[in-house]
Amino acid sequence: MNIYLVGGAVRDSLLNLPVTEQDWVVVGATPEQLLKLGYQQVGKDFPVFLHPVSHEEYALARTERKSGQGYTGFTCYAAPDVTLEDDLLRRDLTVNAIARSADGEFIDPYHGKQDLENRVLRHVSDAFGEDPLRVLRVARFAARFAYLGFTIAPETMSLMSNMAQSGELSALTPERVWKETEKALKTQSPHVYFQVLRDCGALAVLFPEIERLFGVPAPEKWHPEIDTGIHTLMTLAIAAQLSPEVDIRFAALCHDLGKGLTPKEHWPHHHGHGPAGVKLVEQLCQRLRIPNPVRDLAKLVAEYHDLIHTVNKLRPETLLKLFNAIDVWRKPERLEQMIMTSEADARGRTGFENNPYPQGDYLRAAFQIANGVSIQEVVASGLQGLAIRDELQRRRQQALAEWKQTQETPLI
């Protein structure tokens, strides 16, 4: 029996990146042998065991054969005669198919170390094409390692394109699509994930609402990049610089979905695209079963981001309506979320990437004024029921009106 460290831990250590979890493969052993040693079996479809002390995963070396559609349609064979090379052959990318023995020797039959040095993501074998989930995984790895200069091998991209055209992606469950997408949104360059999906044809299959934005023009005065799809990915890239939050990044991705509904005869203008996009956000989130908090912020950003761009010109009552709509009184974190996504939108344009966003400070100051109105004083005045709400609203509006008179109108 021989045990090897495999997969991401080997890859990340070779890249001098922190290793967060370790996976092991066991060659030349049976389930009975591992159970006798105190390992606990957890895998139902294939033999995976937890180490009795470290609780890390140890899997028996196995091969997989395609037996049905989708990413679950595989027959697994695990036995003592399966070699390490056999096990590594079934893995997705060469950089993930490197093993390290107990004495520190690397076993690298598919030249993963060379691809790591050359910063290339390349599939191990044509069996890659049997698992549609791998299209998303490669796009996610491209996003994760983009800052290190990694690119996808042309032959791998070609295979991914064939997979997107084959219809196999429809076998992916909504949960798996969102799980990979959520991981991609957490990377340093989440826009790369969606660009890769577009380049191989998968975006049109999985995210048609986003695909539809490419080729839709916006006025060159405000959008020198012109193309709304390009602007969307630029906005996502800026959002990733501003915040690690998935909610903010996803909202940035979806902020202009409504522009995909504008009739061509109205191009390049998109009046009412914000509210129009709310239904598309709902549709996308329902289809992929995206968590409600992520959905709710994306809907608010789609509807109100343009309003925030002109916040200094808003009347006190409109400012209050905005605060009420985003429920900032009960969810004060929403204020920063809305500001950051709106800033990402403003800066996600060619030539505007490093511009300040004074609207953010203006909105923060306005909220401080409105939030400074004492609820206790209103209650103590003897009012009851809805009259309390109406009086609080009146006082907040008055406070904002007085504050606005002291403000110079900045050029926004």
From Swiss-Prot:
GO biological process, one term: RNA repair
Named cofactor requirement(s): Mg(2+); Ni(2+)
Pfam families, A to Z: HD (PF01966), PolyA_pol (PF01743), PolyA_pol_RNAbd (PF12627)
Keyword Oxidoreductase among record annotations: no
Binding-site residues, CTP: G8, R11, R91, R137, R140
Function noted in UniProt: Catalyzes the addition and repair of the essential 3'-terminal CCA sequence in tRNAs without using a nucleic acid template. Adds these three nucleotides in the order of C, C, and A to the tRNA nucleotide-73, using CTP and ATP as substrates and producing inorganic pyrophosphate. tRNA 3'-terminal CCA addition is required both for tRNA processing and repair. Also involved in tRNA surveillance by mediating tandem CCA addition to generate a CCACCA at the 3' terminus of unstable tRNAs. While stable tRNAs receive only 3'-terminal CCA, unstable tRNAs are marked with CCACCA and rapidly degraded.
Protein name from the UniProt record: Multifunctional CCA protein
This protein's encoding gene: cca
